[in-house]
Regions:
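Alpha/beta-hydrolase-fold enzymes
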Residues: 1-92
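Short, conserved loop/helix-junction motifs that constitute active-site signature segments
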Residues: 18-19, 112-116, 139-143
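Short conserved micro-motifs at the rims of enzyme active sites and ligand-binding pockets
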Residues: 36-37, 132-133, 159-163
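Hydrophobic/aromatic beta-strand patches that form the interior of the parallel beta-sheet core
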Residues: 25-27, 120-122, 149
Length: 186
């Protein structure tokens, strides 16, 4: 979610971004939140969804213990999908009308065309959770401030390459690429 958040902030700031914000990087960002939530619910991704959901429910229960008057512990009972969690908990406690409202309003896709600082997005075409809609892709490609690097493989955040010890490259393609980008814009 961090990639979506930083891209959304950059889009909301647009041309008014402070000069200290020199560049932005998103690695496998869930730019279209609803699409990512739907992808997590696919049978082949249910293991990941269950893990994310278990962690979210654990965090929610911790908040209930810390702030018992602010949160209803029964809201988490029987939740079986990320979308259901977002509908019953995230939306309710974050001021959204529903999960769909949350996915729309919290998505970087809505404002990505307004990004006005050098931005790098790394995305793997075989990412099982993060898919970019054609409409969002068109916005990204039309924005001269955004560099989109898409690899055929990499899944969700597993961008590796052949290492080159003589060049100090250990095969961490994403890390090497984003550092070069950030240092080029310092």
């Amino acid at each position: 979610m961090g990639g979506n958040l930083v891209l959304k902030l950059a889009g909301e700031l647009g041309a008014s971004a402070p000069r200290q914000l020199r560049s932005v990087v998103g690695v496998s960002p869930a730019i279209d939140l609803g699409l990512s939530a739907a992808a997590l619910h696919l049978p082949q991704n249910r293991l990941y969804e269950r893990r994310f959901l278990r962690n979210l429910i654990r965090r929610f229960r911790r908040k209930v213990r810390l702030f018992p008057r602010a949160f209803d512990p029964n809201r988490a009972t029987g939740i079986r999908s990320l979308r259901e969690f977002d509908d019953r908990i995230t939306a309710l406690y974050s001021g959204f009308a529903s999960a769909e409202d949350y996915y729309f309003r919290a998505a970087a896709a809505r404002v990505i065309d307004r990004i006005a600082v050098p931005t790098l997005i790394l995305h793997a075409l075989d990412d099982p959770f993060v898919h970019i809609t054609p409409e969002t892709l068109a916005k990204i490609e039309a924005n001269p401030h955004i560099t989109l690097l898409q690899s055929a493989h990499g899944g969700h955040c597993a961008f590796l390459a052949k290492s080159d010890p003589t060049a100090g490259d250990e095969g961490y393609w994403a890390e090497t690429t984003l550092l070069r980008f950030v240092f080029a814009h310092c």
